[in-house]
Every structure is written in C-alpha cells, then in structure tokens.
Regions:
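Alpha-helix N-cap/helix-start motif at coil-to-helix transitions, marked by capping-box chemistry
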Residues: 15-26, 60, 83, 98, ...
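C-terminal catalytic subdomain
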Residues: 64-120, 126
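Short alpha-helical scaffolding segments that buttress acidic/His motifs in well-ordered protein cores
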Residues: 1-5, 48-55, 89, 125, ...
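Carboxylate- and glycine-rich phosphate/diphosphate-binding segment that chelates Mg2+/Mn2+
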Residues: 1-61
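Amphipathic alpha-helical interaction segments
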Residues: 19-23, 27, 47-50, 68-71, ...
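Amphipathic alpha-helical segments in well-ordered regions
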Residues: 4, 8, 31, 72, ...
C-alpha cells in the first residue's frame, strides 16, 4: 500500500505509473484485510499479488519520505521494512497530503471513501494499521527517540526523498 501511495504522490506526471499506483492501491485496500483474516484465501492472496505487483511497477516513478526514512532506520536498527513503512506512513501523509488535494481525492475515491478529504484518508490508513495491530511509534520496535535528527539528516540524502 505504501508503494502505491508514495508512487502516486510523486509530483512527476507519468500516466502509466499513476494508473498502476491507483489500481494497486485499490486492490491492496480490498484484499489485504481479507488476506490477513484468511491467510489461505486464494482470491485474497491473488488480489494482493496483483495489487503489490502494480504498486511495484508504479514506484518506477519514485517514492518519497516514508521510504527515505525507512531506509535509514532499517540500515541502522535492522527493522523490518514493511513494518517500518507502515509506522511512518500516517505521519508523512499528514505532511504531504495538504500539498496534494487532487491526489488525495483520487486515492480516497480509489478505495471507495465517501469523504475524499485528507483527514478521512489518513483515518482510513490508521484504522487499517490498528486492525492489523501495527505499532504506532518507532520506539515500539526498538528505534530510540534520540536518533531523530541523525536519521532525518541521512534520510534527506536518500534518493526517495528527492521525489517526495
């Protein structure tokens, strides 16, 4: 999901990647909860396969600050990439979405939210993370708070930060 969201929000225009990102986001949003609840559900796993593949294609366009920060945290603290991304995603959405109202509306529509505003989209992501019992802070996965300035400085040098 993070791959699709970040790729879609990269400012460069790339209709093929944008289409892949939106369709990937839609599929992951639909099938991830089912796949988590029913790990042997072949339809859910297939939906996740296609959604993840589309999101992977989409990020040929670039990624953003979630990945820039996650790369640095993972390298220094050996955290799991997807989990680190999931924890960081809502905070970066709060930073990025005010600058991309049309992108927010498009993503919210793709996941069938009635309210297509920024806060509704972030609330939806947070609800999914809560459902999956994802920790709400990096300190809960062993990342100390005293590293914030160092990680931020390193993250701004990451190639993903350049396409945020």
């Amino acid at each position: 999901m993070t791959h699709a969201i970040e790729a879609y929000l990269v400012p460069d225009f790339h209709p093929l990647c944008d289409g892949a990102a939106i369709q990937g986001l839609s599929l992951v949003n639909k099938w991830l909860p089912v796949a988590v609840q029913e790990p042997k559900n072949i339809s859910a796993r297939g939906g996740m396969l296609v959604g993840s593949c589309l999101a992977g294609i989409a990020f040929l366009k670039g990624l953003g600050l979630v990945h820039a920060i996650s790369h640095m945290i993972g390298a220094e603290f050996d955290t799991q990439h997807g989990l680190t991304n999931a924890i960081i995603l809502p905070k970066i959405l709060e930073y990025n979405l005010p600058h991309t109202p049309e992108g927010t509306r498009t993503m919210a529509s793709a996941i069938h939210l009635k309210d297509t505003g920024q806060q509704s989209f972030i609330n939806h992501i947070n609800a999914l993370l809560d459902d999956f019992k994802i920790p709400t802070s990096l300190s809960k996965i062993g990342v100390p708070t005293d590293c914030v300035a160092r990680i931020a400085t390193k993250a701004m040098q990451d190639s993903a930060a350049k396409t945020n």
